């Protein structure tokens, strides 16, 4: 009898998703050659000295040092002229474009682009309808400037390592006294370092989602591109002499050289940031929860407060881009908010850097959206918390640039916090728009895909896509070829919902405000916090049953 009463009093279980979705080393025999061999570098210099006699070796060396060094060309680009024949529906050499650049021959579509297009599933009709969008996504995919830097401070489940970097170091008045500046490095040293980096460059790593919902295309990508021609009042390149301006880490050889810091300089900078002392005396009960390319993640307890924290331990000798760690720490340290997974502390322990962050035991929102069904009240609660985080970041001139369910962490109490600042970009009034292709393709805003200058509202578009994730369990176009997905993002406007009639009018209006193609008409974080949809938000504690149900479903599926 009592058992029957207990069963009646238990709330129904949350609804689950049914388908959780080498060079030639042989030496030349010069003696057999009828022609004289090419003079070596030293012989060239000796001959030049005989032609232009100086005082002595020391004088010549001094003069050589005084001569201005002419660097290799940088930031150059190969302009490809491609036209489109509306009759045949084929991409052709653009004769007019070639005439605009004297000396250039018409090239037509490059072979690698043609191969990409053949496997893209973009139909001939779609190519004919919007050839420029096709070219935009082809340029993005064929870029050789893509980099795969670690997001060092990533603390999400499984210690995911994704493709990303801090695009700008903090430059607010709070941090102006300690900008992570990098002194110039000599050309010879830098070339050697660059060769070593190229040889040791790890292969690209796919950013993870839960195994049962993972797509090979769901990864974060970064492409450094030339800024489009825009009025100076809108975009002004940051001045190298202005210590308070944001210096962008553009992915070019010359700028990588300028941003070099020696290991000793990095250690000196880190010593000025980290806390003094032994973290093993402050934290106890270390438990390993993840291992990644950039380090190992543990949970631990703060002895003084009893707070559970996440600690990432990184061997600095194994980090290829150590200066980016400094930038990421500084960005996180200066942007603390209740809706952000906050940086707590850091320590140098031997050759390791230990970074202490808040720990949220509920896991990522991805687990909830792929394993359970959320109602509008729960979705509104998550959107409100994310908008509060974005309003804070945007008001501090920070764009997150990688908003998606993977980067939203949940506490067991239902708290919602934004994490993963490996892509975040700081902007100043002079640098009010950015034009770097960055983020995860399926969550990208159209202005990013089409390589236009953009601002904080790219995060709002991504939030709208994440809201669709919460409804449907995945973002739009996830099962499309990535090239076609980018084409659809660039051309379709607001993505269509599978069953829009199931959503309330106020929710559909919220989605339309987030997913407005016209950036000027798209809502800002501050504006959307006043949207009527958020009044439907349930208490955050309503998320707890979903978190528990998702954990159970994942545990059962792994058996």
Curated annotation (Swiss-Prot):
Region (Autoregulatory region): 65-150
Active site (UniProt): 402
Limits of the CRIB domain: 70-83
Binding residues annotated for ATP, in chain numbering: 289-297, 312
Subcellular location(s) per record: Cytoplasm
GO biological process: axonogenesis; cell migration; cellular response to starvation; dendrite development; dendritic spine morphogenesis; ephrin receptor signaling pathway; intracellular signal transduction; regulation of actin cytoskeleton organization
PROSITE patterns: CRIB, PROTEIN_KINASE_ATP, PROTEIN_KINASE_DOM, PROTEIN_KINASE_ST
Function: Serine/threonine protein kinase that plays a role in a variety of different signaling pathways including cytoskeleton regulation, cell migration, or cell cycle regulation. Plays a role in dendrite spine morphogenesis as well as synapse formation and plasticity. Acts as a downstream effector of the small GTPases CDC42 and RAC1. Activation by the binding of active CDC42 and RAC1 results in a conformational change and a subsequent autophosphorylation on several serine and/or threonine residues.
Protein name: Serine/threonine-protein kinase PAK 3
Source taxonomy: Eukaryota, Metazoa, Chordata, Craniata, Vertebrata
Gene name in the database record: PAK3
